[in-house]
Protein backbone atom coordinates (compact mmCIF):
# COMPACT_ATOMS: atom_id res chain seq x y z
CA UNK A 1 0.00 0.00 0.00
CA UNK A 2 2.99 2.30 0.29
CA UNK A 3 2.84 3.11 -3.42
CA UNK A 4 -0.52 4.86 -2.92
CA UNK A 5 1.33 7.75 -1.32
CA UNK A 6 2.75 8.62 -4.74
CA UNK A 7 -0.68 9.00 -6.35
CA UNK A 8 -1.67 12.61 -6.74
CA UNK A 9 -5.20 12.62 -5.33
CA UNK A 10 -7.15 15.58 -6.70
CA UNK A 11 -8.72 17.86 -4.08
CA UNK A 12 -11.79 19.92 -5.04
CA UNK A 13 -10.47 23.16 -3.50
CA UNK A 14 -7.36 22.90 -5.70
CA UNK A 15 -8.88 21.88 -9.02
CA UNK A 16 -12.30 23.56 -9.07
CA UNK A 17 -10.92 27.14 -9.26
CA UNK A 18 -8.97 26.02 -12.36
CA UNK A 19 -12.24 25.06 -14.05
CA UNK A 20 -11.88 21.33 -13.47
CA UNK A 21 -15.12 19.58 -12.59
CA UNK A 22 -14.61 15.88 -11.88
CA UNK A 23 -17.41 13.46 -12.61
CA UNK A 24 -17.33 12.00 -9.10
CA UNK A 25 -16.73 13.17 -5.58
CA UNK A 26 -15.04 10.36 -3.66
CA UNK A 27 -16.34 10.69 -0.11
CA UNK A 28 -13.68 9.00 2.02
CA UNK A 29 -15.75 9.02 5.22
CA UNK A 30 -14.75 8.64 8.85
CA UNK A 31 -13.79 4.97 8.57
CA UNK A 32 -11.69 5.56 5.46
CA UNK A 33 -9.93 8.45 7.15
CA UNK A 34 -9.39 7.11 10.66
CA UNK A 35 -9.77 3.32 10.92
CA UNK A 36 -6.51 1.55 10.06
CA UNK A 37 -8.20 -1.39 8.34
CA UNK A 38 -10.65 0.77 6.41
CA UNK A 39 -7.84 3.11 5.31
CA UNK A 40 -6.64 0.15 3.26
CA UNK A 41 -10.01 0.03 1.48
CA UNK A 42 -9.80 3.76 0.72
CA UNK A 43 -6.24 3.40 -0.60
CA UNK A 44 -7.09 0.38 -2.74
CA UNK A 45 -10.16 2.08 -4.20
CA UNK A 46 -8.13 5.22 -4.92
CA UNK A 47 -5.57 3.08 -6.75
CA UNK A 48 -8.35 1.62 -8.90
CA UNK A 49 -9.78 5.08 -9.67
CA UNK A 50 -6.31 6.31 -10.60
CA UNK A 51 -5.46 3.21 -12.67
CA UNK A 52 -8.67 3.57 -14.70
CA UNK A 53 -8.30 7.35 -15.10
CA UNK A 54 -11.66 7.98 -13.44
CA UNK A 55 -12.49 11.67 -13.14
CA UNK A 56 -12.78 12.16 -9.38
CA UNK A 57 -11.72 14.36 -6.50
CA UNK A 58 -11.94 14.37 -2.72
CA UNK A 59 -12.84 17.22 -0.39
CA UNK A 60 -9.72 16.71 1.71
CA UNK A 61 -9.79 19.03 4.72
CA UNK A 62 -13.26 20.22 3.74
CA UNK A 63 -14.76 16.77 4.29
CA UNK A 64 -16.70 16.73 7.55
CA UNK A 65 -19.09 14.28 9.16
CA UNK A 66 -22.24 13.38 7.22
CA UNK A 67 -24.29 13.83 10.37
CA UNK A 68 -25.27 10.17 10.41
CA UNK A 69 -24.00 9.47 13.96
CA UNK A 70 -25.85 12.52 15.29
CA UNK A 71 -29.09 11.50 13.61
CA UNK A 72 -28.85 7.88 14.80
CA UNK A 73 -28.20 9.17 18.34
CA UNK A 74 -31.32 11.34 18.15
CA UNK A 75 -29.67 14.74 17.73
CA UNK A 76 -31.68 15.95 14.73
CA UNK A 77 -30.50 19.56 15.03
CA UNK A 78 -26.81 18.58 14.82
CA UNK A 79 -27.56 16.21 11.92
CA UNK A 80 -29.30 18.95 9.96
CA UNK A 81 -26.50 21.43 10.65
CA UNK A 82 -23.86 18.97 9.42
CA UNK A 83 -25.92 17.87 6.42
CA UNK A 84 -26.70 21.42 5.34
CA UNK A 85 -23.01 22.38 5.59
CA UNK A 86 -22.16 19.42 3.32
CA UNK A 87 -24.96 20.25 0.90
CA UNK A 88 -23.64 23.81 0.70
CA UNK A 89 -20.15 22.49 -0.07
CA UNK A 90 -21.51 20.07 -2.68
CA UNK A 91 -23.50 22.89 -4.29
CA UNK A 92 -20.45 25.17 -4.40
CA UNK A 93 -18.49 22.46 -6.23
CA UNK A 94 -21.45 21.43 -8.42
CA UNK A 95 -21.32 17.85 -7.15
CA UNK A 96 -23.75 15.51 -8.91
CA UNK A 97 -22.29 12.05 -8.21
CA UNK A 98 -20.84 10.73 -4.97
CA UNK A 99 -18.75 7.57 -4.60
CA UNK A 100 -18.48 6.20 -1.09
CA UNK A 101 -16.87 3.17 0.53
CA UNK A 102 -18.98 3.45 3.68
CA UNK A 103 -22.49 1.94 3.83
CA UNK A 104 -23.56 4.52 6.43
CA UNK A 105 -22.47 7.43 4.23
CA UNK A 106 -24.12 5.78 1.23
CA UNK A 107 -27.39 5.42 3.11
CA UNK A 108 -27.56 8.93 4.50
CA UNK A 109 -26.59 10.64 1.22
CA UNK A 110 -29.06 8.52 -0.74
CA UNK A 111 -32.02 8.46 1.62
CA UNK A 112 -31.78 11.38 4.07
CA UNK A 113 -30.05 14.25 2.28
CA UNK A 114 -32.79 14.56 -0.39
CA UNK A 115 -35.20 15.72 2.36
CA UNK A 116 -32.88 18.71 2.88
CA UNK A 117 -32.43 19.43 -0.83
CA UNK A 118 -29.31 17.32 -1.36
CA UNK A 119 -30.17 15.17 -4.35
CA UNK A 120 -27.22 13.24 -5.76
CA UNK A 121 -26.44 10.05 -7.58
CA UNK A 122 -24.88 8.05 -4.75
CA UNK A 123 -22.82 4.99 -5.66
CA UNK A 124 -21.35 2.50 -3.23
CA UNK A 125 -17.91 1.37 -4.29
CA UNK A 126 -19.07 -2.24 -4.76
CA UNK A 127 -21.71 -1.01 -7.22
CA UNK A 128 -19.06 1.02 -9.02
CA UNK A 129 -16.66 -1.93 -9.19
CA UNK A 130 -19.45 -4.23 -10.36
CA UNK A 131 -20.27 -1.82 -13.20
CA UNK A 132 -16.60 -1.52 -14.21
CA UNK A 133 -16.21 -5.31 -14.21
CA UNK A 134 -19.39 -5.83 -16.24
CA UNK A 135 -18.22 -3.24 -18.78
CA UNK A 136 -14.81 -4.99 -18.99
CA UNK A 137 -13.08 -1.82 -17.83
CA UNK A 138 -11.75 -3.51 -14.71
CA UNK A 139 -10.02 -6.82 -15.22
CA UNK A 140 -9.66 -9.12 -12.23
CA UNK A 141 -7.11 -11.89 -12.03
CA UNK A 142 -9.25 -14.46 -10.25
CA UNK A 143 -6.33 -16.89 -9.99
CA UNK A 144 -4.80 -14.83 -7.17
CA UNK A 145 -7.54 -15.61 -4.65
CA UNK A 146 -9.23 -18.62 -6.26
CA UNK A 147 -8.22 -20.97 -3.46
CA UNK A 148 -8.96 -18.51 -0.67
CA UNK A 149 -12.12 -18.91 1.32
CA UNK A 150 -14.09 -15.67 1.78
CA UNK A 151 -16.86 -15.25 4.34
CA UNK A 152 -19.22 -12.37 3.69
CA UNK A 153 -21.67 -10.47 5.87
CA UNK A 154 -23.86 -7.71 4.44
CA UNK A 155 -23.38 -4.29 5.98
CA UNK A 156 -26.78 -3.41 7.47
CA UNK A 157 -26.99 -0.03 5.76
CA UNK A 158 -26.16 -1.48 2.36
CA UNK A 159 -28.26 -4.64 2.46
CA UNK A 160 -31.19 -4.22 4.80
CA UNK A 161 -31.65 -0.47 4.42
CA UNK A 162 -30.93 -0.19 0.69
CA UNK A 163 -31.60 -3.69 -0.61
CA UNK A 164 -28.18 -3.86 -2.26
CA UNK A 165 -27.10 -7.45 -2.01
CA UNK A 166 -25.91 -8.23 -5.53
CA UNK A 167 -22.99 -5.86 -6.12
CA UNK A 168 -20.75 -7.08 -3.28
CA UNK A 169 -21.42 -10.70 -4.16
CA UNK A 170 -20.76 -10.24 -7.86
CA UNK A 171 -17.43 -8.57 -7.11
CA UNK A 172 -16.48 -11.29 -4.63
CA UNK A 173 -17.48 -14.03 -7.06
CA UNK A 174 -15.03 -12.57 -9.57
CA UNK A 175 -12.12 -12.94 -7.16
CA UNK A 176 -12.92 -16.22 -5.42
CA UNK A 177 -14.93 -19.35 -6.00
CA UNK A 178 -15.24 -20.12 -2.30
CA UNK A 179 -17.74 -17.68 -0.83
CA UNK A 180 -19.56 -18.49 2.40
CA UNK A 181 -22.53 -16.47 3.58
CA UNK A 182 -22.48 -15.67 7.29
CA UNK A 183 -25.46 -16.90 9.25
CA UNK A 184 -28.11 -14.32 10.01
Predicted features and spans:
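Iron-sulfur-cluster electron-transfer modules
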Residues: 1-101, 106-113, 117, 132-135
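Conserved active-site and cofactor/substrate-binding residues in soluble primary-metabolism enzymes
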Residues: 40, 81, 127, 163, ...
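Short, acidic/turn-prone active-site loops that include or flank metal/cofactor-
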Residues: 124-130, 184
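Short hydrophobic/aromatic-enriched beta-strand-loop microsegments
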Residues: 118-125, 180
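Redox cofactor-anchoring modules in respiratory/redox and cofactor-processing assemblies
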Residues: 134-184
Amino acid sequence: MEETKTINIPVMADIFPKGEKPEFLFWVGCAGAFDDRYKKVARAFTKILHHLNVSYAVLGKEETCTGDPARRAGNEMLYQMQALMNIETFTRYEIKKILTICPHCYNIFKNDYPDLGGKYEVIHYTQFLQKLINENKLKIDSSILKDNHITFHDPCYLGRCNNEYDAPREVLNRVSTKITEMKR
